[in-house]
Amino acid sequence: MDKNIKREIEIKRAKLLLLKNKENCTDAVSSSNKEGPKQISEDQLSNFLCKILKPTNLTPQTYSLESKSSNLVSDCELKISSVYQSYSSTFNVSNHVPSISKTVNIRETSKHLKHSTKAPKCSLPTSALEIDHLNNFLHSSAKILDRALCDQSNQLFTDYTVKKKSKKNKSQLEENGLNHLFTFQDEKITLNSVVNSISYSSFFEELLITSYAKPKEALRTRGLAIVWNQRWKNSPESVLKARSEITVCKPSPFHPQLIAGGAYNGQVFLWDLRQGQYPVSFTTIISGGHLEPVTDITYINNPPSNNIVTCSTDGLVHIWEPDMFSRPSETICLSSQVDSSSQCIPATCLSFIPENNMEFLVGAEDGKLQRGYRSDYSETKAVQPSNVSYEGHNVFISGIDVMTSNSQNVFLEKNKDFALTSSFDWTVRLWQCSPSRNQHELVPSNDLDEQVIINSCKTFTHKAMVFDVKWCVSEPCCFASVDALGNLNLWDLQKDVEAPVTSDIPDGKPLNKIAWQPEKRNLACGGLNGNVHIYKHLSPNLAN
């Protein structure tokens, strides 16, 4: 009897265990199944448990990258990483916000995505076009971020409860009309370089274009020009390059994106800021370009097109159309007689008469100041009659600037054109472009016409060689000059005609180029060490 009872108990226990296992399996298959538990065989149960214990869909859907060729993915990662490296080299957010990392590792990011529990969509660019778009986006975004971080607003932390500082605390330099703002320099790009030219943009008042050279090297280096932004002082806005050293570079006053430059080998380059850092057009010797270094560039409005005018030490002035650099539209020979065998005049600087596209003044290496007239035809023409000469300088003329006076002064006459010339003879001279009869000196000559000598109105003596001079745009009686001692001199003809009203030596190095900001009071000067200094000119009314 006892044996039968034990046997029945074991049978019931086995049935209960089997029912319990079946209920657990059905709950694992689907908790939302409304039908009752079904009979599952041991093979089906084992297969089901294997599917649960060894899932095949745990890795995220990142096979789109692996399904492509491995070479394309590796190239893509390398290109993207190079873009991030160039981005981090030009703009390091961690310099301003330390909590942000400087670099981004693409490979570490991809590993993290592959081992994550979720499956995010991968949007890494795989084509060259997408990588170029990403590169342009990063560079443009970096500039915008850096401009915002570098914006130094004096009104941001103004405390209106504190008494304003007294004017007595101002430096003597500020009281006399100059205030040093900041300095443009880049040790990686402009180290051991010399500033060849400085020019402001006529469309964007904050943009400044400078060209550089490295005279210490035995061979002439490739050309370098930098577009600086006065609102973004940490790094250049754009870097322009050329095959030869850029001797002069000026932006177009008629197009906001075009910049023309002259080179040491005689070529003329034209850059478009929308097309990258290399020229979109350039001249050659075969096309009738210059044979010697280009010394100056200017623009004239000659409807229906706007022309680029270049002069060189080869004694020629070329007039170019921006859309056709195959040959100059006009050539002017800087000599007294076209058909004579005399040597051409080596031009060093050039400036057109305001509101007159037919007349210009050009300085030469021998100190002569010549008056030129454009021809209505494409043939070579003499620069001026042989019986007219400007007497004053006797050595190299380094700079020239012409303006129309809108004020009356002892030396300036209203609505008349006046020119300033700087020279290596330690002087700056003032000339009237259309002098009156009493400024002429008649000298007997064997020719039928009398020799006419035009003398300068005033001579401003300096303490060293003068490298450049420019009229002030906002103050008609003021001009600035720079010399070999590193002096930035500010002259005011209404205050003193014998000495500058103020002077400053930015860093003790010689200064050789200067430029005024259009319709503003900012002044830029560059030196032989590659630094560009920005000053603010305070008029007497503002200074007082």
UniProtKB/Swiss-Prot annotation:
InterPro entries: Dynein_IC, WD40/YVTN_repeat-like_dom_sf, WD40_repeat_dom_sf, WD40_rpt. Its main location: cytoplasm. WD repeats lie at residues 241-281, 289-330, 342-387, 402-441, 461-501, 506-544. Keywords: Cytoplasm, Meiosis, Repeat, WD repeat. GO terms for molecular function: ATP hydrolysis activity; dynein heavy chain binding; dynein light chain binding. One of its GO terms (cellular component) is meiotic spindle pole body. The keyword DNA repair does not apply. PROSITE patterns: WD_REPEATS_1, WD_REPEATS_2, WD_REPEATS_REGION. It is found in: Cytoplasm. GO terms for biological process: dynein-driven meiotic oscillatory nuclear movement; transport along microtubule. Pfam families: WD40. Has a role in meiotic nuclear divsion where it promotes the movement of 'horsetails'. Belongs to the dynein intermediate chain family. This is Dynein intermediate chain 1. It comes from Schizosaccharomyces pombe (strain 972 / ATCC 24843) (Fission yeast). The gene is dic1.
